[in-house]
Amino acid sequence: MNYFISFVINYLTIMLSEEKLSGLIITYNEEKNIAEVLECFDFCDEIIIVDSFSTDKTLEIARTCPKVKVIQHPFHNFTEQRNIALEHAKNDWVLFLDGDERITPELKTEIIETLHSQHSKDAYYFYRKFFFERRAIYFSGTQNDKNFRLFRKSKAKYVADKKVHETLDIKENIGVLKNKLLHYSVSDIESYRKKMIHYG
């Protein structure tokens, strides 16, 4: 069975199941990314965007998708924005993505199968494959990078005292998905320089 047929079957399964999924993202001036992120969320029951008053076309593009619900909130820190998204999600299962992250068809299928497994955990780590200028990065120390992206919001919350690289507070029943999330972390040299200055 090829991936397309498998995905269609799994997609129909999730639509008929009680297990629904909310796709969550926080944004500020993500017009270059938002359309692709929304495509990654196409199997979600709803999409929650917490936006920090973008000045570009982020929201104009986002509102073309009928599943999208936009909440505008001033940016204080990443932890607060993510927890606001959790508060507005109507489903227990949530999938968080950043603007520079993408889901492969294989990962999407694995997520759907995980939601319907009788042995599903409460939270799942995603390993990430990093890209620089759309080219995959190897041997850079990023091979073991992983983050929580799929979890039950009833079992977890972002720790409030973490301002950057926020931490999900969950104690046990944790799993890891085998397919990697694509992370287009740096688009060019100038973006890399600005990122290092900002987080340095």
Which ranges hold each PLM region?
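Short acidic donor-binding/metal-coordinating loop in glycosyltransferase active sites
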Residues: S52, H73-F75, N91, D98-E101, ...
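Short, well-formed alpha-helical segments that are part of the catalytic scaffolds
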Residues: I25-F43
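Acidic helix N-cap motif at the loop->helix transition within catalytic regions
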Residues: K32-E36, D56-T64, E106-L107
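Cell-envelope/extracellular polymer assembly enzymes that use nucleotide-activated donors
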Residues: K20-S22
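Catalytic-site signature of metal-activated, phosphate-bearing donor transferases
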Residues: E80-L86, W93, T104-G200
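Conserved donor nucleotide-binding strand/loop of the catalytic core
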Residues: L59-H88
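Active-site acidic short loop of glycosyltransferases
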Residues: E18, A89-D92
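A conserved acidic beta->alpha catalytic loop
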Residues: C40, D51-E60, D98
